Amino acid sequence: GLAAVLPWGLCFALFKRIARWQWLYGVQCREALAQALQRDCCDDADAWLAERRLVTLLDHADHYLLRTRSVAWIERHVQVHGQWEPGGRAALLWTFHWGTGMWALRHARAHGLKAPMVLAAPSGPDFVGRAVFGLYVRARMRSVDLALGEPVIFVPGGMAEVRGALACGQQVVVVMDVPQDQVAVTRVTPLLNVPVSVPAVLPQLAVDQSLPVTVFYMGVDIRTGFR
């Protein structure tokens, strides 16, 4: 919550220092580093881990920044490449589980898109005995509601709402890198020369209905904190 109370420049400088703490997000970072080394995506393990921790800190901070900063403030800190699909027409907006994407949702809404987001329901084994974690996840989902101005569509069980939104000429935001065990139908496709499983239902829906698809992501300049 430091991002909610500190000037952003000071907060980001503090985050860069905190990201050097080797114990921070220890298990998650070690698992991620093992994957990066396996895929030959890492030359300097210490630098890679510091960046991984920084991106995680920023991902958490964006929840609080979205709640406490104006659209104008956010847009002053974002450099945009490309454009959104025009509003008023059904379309799919695809993105990925890569930190710092919250501001992109606010940007989409500010540019006229009506786009509910498809998210996994906050339930299941990951939430058992983790009350604080559950409250935080639900608060983040509320931030997604606020960013887009549309209620989240929860899955499983949300396909009727997805079809309804598309029938009303809305866009639907979909995160495509979902674990194989969390979706019923998948397809194998190459990514960075590695076969990966991706959800198949919504891509097939896009083909069947000739829906425009816009792929978007929001990166971060780790020197400045700009997106």
Please annotate each region the language model reported:
Residues 81-84, 105-109, 141-142, 162-163, ...:
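Short amphipathic alpha-helical segments and helix-helix/interface helices
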Residues 89-154, 184:
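Catalytic core of membrane glycerolipid acyltransferases/transacylases, capturing the structured
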Residues 1-102, 138-143:
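Membrane-anchoring hydrophobic helices of lipid-metabolizing enzymes
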Residues 221-227:
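Conserved active-site-proximal loop/helix segments of enzymes involved in bacterial cell-wall
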Residues 157-160, 164-221:
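Membrane-associated lipid acylation/remodeling enzymes share a hydrophobic transmembrane-juxtamembrane segment
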Residues 76-82, 149-156:
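Short acidic-hydrophobic, aromatic-tinged amphipathic segments that line or gate anion-handling sites
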Residues 40-44, 112-115, 147-149, 200, ...:
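Structural alpha-beta junctions
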Residues 87-89, 147-148, 168-169, 209:
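Structured helix-beta-strand junction loops
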